[in-house]
C-alpha cells in the first residue's frame, strides 16, 4: 500500500500526536473496530479522568478520532498514528 502524500502541517500534527505515548496508545486501542469511551478508559488502566479526557479531546479536535453512535473510530490520520503509516 502506497503512503499517501501529506503536507507539512499534517506531518507536524502527526508528529505532535505520536510524541505523546498516551495518545498513541489510545489510537492503538481504538484500532479499526471502534470502541466506547468507557471501554477505552478501562483498557488504558490507570489513567486519571482529566488525563483521559484531555488527550481524547485532543485526538478528536485534531482529526485523529471521530465519535459516531457512541463509539470512537480512527480517521485515516488516526490509522497513521496507531500503525505508523
UniProtKB/Swiss-Prot annotation:
Source species, domain of life: Archaea
Family the entry assigns: To A.fulgidus AF_0255 and AF_1363.
Full protein name: Uncharacterized protein AF_1348
Species the sequence originates in: Archaeoglobus fulgidus (strain ATCC 49558 / DSM 4304 / JCM 9628 / NBRC 100126 / VC-16)
Lineage of origin: Archaea, Methanobacteriati, Methanobacteriota, Archaeoglobi, Archaeoglobales
Amino acid at each position: 500500500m502506497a503512503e499517501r502524500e501529506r503536507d507539512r502541517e499534517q506531518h507536524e500534527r502527526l508528529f505532535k500526536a505520536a510524541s505523546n505515548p498516551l495518545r498513541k496508545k489510545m489510537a492503538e486501542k481504538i484500532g479499526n473496530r471502534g470502541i466506547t469511551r468507557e471501554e477505552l478508559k478501562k483498557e488504558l488502566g490507570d489513567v486519571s479522568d482529566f488525563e483521559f479526557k484531555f488527550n481524547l479531546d485532543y485526538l478528536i479536535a485534531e482529526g485523529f478520532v471521530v465519535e459516531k453512535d457512541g463509539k470512537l473510530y480512527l480517521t485515516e490520520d488516526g490509522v497513521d498514528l496507531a500503525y505508523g503509516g
